């Protein structure tokens, strides 16, 4: 029996997070306190919220000065995964934004600068993941919040082995999280129970005294 055959299949959920931008790695991003009007934010009116302008919805949002906006995909199974998609600035002028990908698994450096009136194609590398691992897209506004809004569209491609054909296992726009419930616990199969069931089904245990 191959234990890999009984690992949870590769699925996952999206989470929207934020954190102070200290210039270093974002280790424990925070959940947003409020989801209303289709977006996550830190107060009813983003213009006067505790973290001004910071908000995120299925189609895009706005960053906050010296804060990081984090799109997190939380794996619920095992395999290989990558984050891909694009992000585009929607307003003329404004300061540069910075973005990068990060993961709790080993991930080669992937980052870029998002200038005014520009867009970036995000094509993350393949990484080995197991249930509980995360892949993050992190957007920063180190030069202030005079940057206008943005649109985005991200997905997770997955495969169980390097030889397998990739498939889309998650899409941010169609699966955008509207609650902050903890991710479900993925359960592995029981190889011995499956073996007994297989033998029983094949009549190996069926006999008459």
Give the label of every model feature segment.
Residues 1-186:
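Gly-Asp-aromatic-enriched flexible segments
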